[in-house]
A protein has these predicted regions:
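Catalytic metal-binding acidic patch
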Residues: 1-17, 184
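A short secondary-structure junction signal
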Residues: 79-84
Length: 226
C-alpha cells in the first residue's frame, strides 16, 4: 500500500520531541510546518547524509531523506456541528497552505477528485502562490490544528496526513500501542489495527492494490554522504 513508515505521536509528545531536538546527531534536524521553507503538512525528521531527487509537483527537487512525523490532535465528535465547523476551518487553512507552495508541494500525477482538480487548475491559472505567504499559511494551519486538546476529546486525527479529516478515528484505537513486525524491524503500532486497516483499506486489506494504486514517493537516491 505504501513505500515507507510514518511516525504518529500526540501533540504533547511532539512538543517533547521539539525540546530534545538539540540532542539529535549533527546530520539530523526537525523540520516543522511553522518553519520558513517547510513544504509539507507533516513534520519531518531529516537526515542530511542522503540526497534524493523528488519528482513531485511542477518542479523536480533535490532534498535530504526524511521520516514523516504525524501529529495526533483532538477533533470534535464526527457528525456534530462543532465537527463540521472545525472541518471547514481546517480544510480552508490546508488549502491556503497548499496554494502557498503549489509548485513544490502538490503532486500533479496523483488521482484527484473533481473538486481537487478544480483547485489545482485554479492555482495553475492564477499563480496564487505568489500572493500567499508560505510561513503565515503554515502557522495558520498549525493554529487551527491545535484547537482541540486530544486528552479532552473522544476522537483524534493525524490531520497532516493526505486523508485530512478522513483520518478521524476513535481515540481508543491508538491505545498504548503494541509491537508489530514491519519487514525486518519491530515498530510500535496502534492497538486497534483491525479497525484502522478495515476503515482505510476495506475488509480485504491483506490484498495489496495494483502497483499503480499504491502510494509511492517517486524518488531517486542521488547522493550518499556517510
Amino acid at each position: 500500500w505504501d513505500d515507507d513508515v510514518d511516525i504518529a505521536m500526540s501533540r504533547k509528545d511532539f512538543e517533547k520531541l521539539k525540546q530534545y531536538q538539540n540532542e539529535f546527531p549533527q546530520y539530523m534536524f526537525l523540520d516543522t510546518i511553522q518553519q520558513k521553507g517547510h513544504q509539507w503538512t507533516a513534520a519531518h525528521v531529516v537526515d542530511t547524509r542522503y540526497k534524493l531527487e523528488v519528482g513531485k509537483g511542477m518542479k523536480k527537487a533535490t532534498m535530504s531523506v526524511w521520516v514523516d512525523i504525524l501529529i495526533i490532535d483532538g477533533v470534535p465528535n464526527p457528525g456534530t456541528f462543532k465537527y463540521k465547523i472545525f472541518s471547514a476551518a481546517y480544510l480552508t487553512a490546508r488549502l491556503l497552505y497548499k496554494f502557498s507552495n503549489f509548485s513544490n508541494e502538490v503532486d500533479l500525477e496523483k488521482d484527484r477528485s473533481a473538486i481537487e482538480t478544480f483547485f489545482i487548475s485554479f492555482a495553475r491559472i492564477t499563480h496564487i502562490e505568489k500572493v500567499i505567504n508560505q510561513h503565515w499559511a503554515g502557522c495558520f494551519i498549525d493554529w487551527i490544528s491545535r484547537r482541540y486538546d486530544l486528552d479532552k476529546c473522544e476522537y483524534g486525527a493525524t490531520l497532516g496526513s493526505p486523508q485530512k479529516m478522513g483520518e478521524t478515528q476513535p481515540k481508543y484505537w491508538f491505545g498504548k500501542g503494541k509491537e508489530l513486525l514491519f519487514e525486518d524491524i519491530i515498530v510500535n503500532g496502534m492497538e486497534e489495527t483491525e479497525n484502522f486497516l478495515t476503515k482505510f483499506y476495506g475488509p480485504n486489506y491483506m490484498t495489496p492494490p495494483p502497483l499503480d494504486k499504491r502510494n509511492q514517493h517517486n524518488v531517486r537516491l542521488v547522493e550518499k554522504i556517510v
